[in-house]
């Protein structure tokens, strides 16, 4: 699950995750997608760039 807010500045970033993931999986450049979405702060950019979905990996162990 993507965090709702950026850990550093507190900006809401979770509403960008679905579109970011879809467009990057379609082959667009991640930096261009972030620029297009208006995410300019490097702290917010790293939240989306470095996020890894672990829910599906960890769910069998509960």
Curated annotation (Swiss-Prot):
Alphabetical keyword list: Cytoplasm, DNA-directed RNA polymerase, Metal-binding, Nucleotidyltransferase, Transcription, Transferase, Zinc
Keyword Cytoplasm: yes
A GO biological-process term: DNA-templated transcription
Major localization class: cytoplasm
Family matches, as PROSITE patterns: RNA_POL_N_8KD
Entry superkingdom: Archaea
Cofactor note text: Binds 1 zinc ion.
Residues holding Zn(2+): 6, 9, 43-44
Enzyme Commission code(s) on record: 2.7.7.6
SUPFAM superfamilies on file: RNA polymerase subunit RPB10 (SSF46924)
Pfam families (UniProt xref): RNA_pol_N (PF01194)
A single cellular component GO annotation: cytoplasm
Chemical reaction(s) catalysed: RNA(n) + a ribonucleoside 5'-triphosphate = RNA(n+1) + diphosphate
Necessary cofactors: Zn(2+)
Cell compartments where the protein resides: Cytoplasm
GO molecular function, one term: zinc ion binding
Family according to the record: Belongs to the archaeal Rpo10/eukaryotic RPB10 RNA polymerase subunit family.
Subunit-structure text: Part of the RNA polymerase complex.
Function comment: DNA-dependent RNA polymerase (RNAP) catalyzes the transcription of DNA into RNA using the four ribonucleoside triphosphates as substrates.
UniProt xrefs under HAMAP family: RNApol_arch_Rpo10
Protein name as catalogued: DNA-directed RNA polymerase subunit Rpo10
Organism: Methanosarcina barkeri (strain Fusaro / DSM 804)
């Amino acid at each position: 699950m993507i965090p709702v807010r950026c850990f550093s500045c507190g900006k809401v970033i979770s509403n960008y995750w679905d579109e970011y993931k879809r467009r990057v999986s379609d082959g667009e450049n991640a930096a261009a997608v972030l620029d297009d979405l208006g995410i300019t702060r490097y702290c917010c950019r790293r939240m989306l760039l470095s996020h890894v979905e672990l829910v599906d990996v960890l769910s069998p162990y509960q």
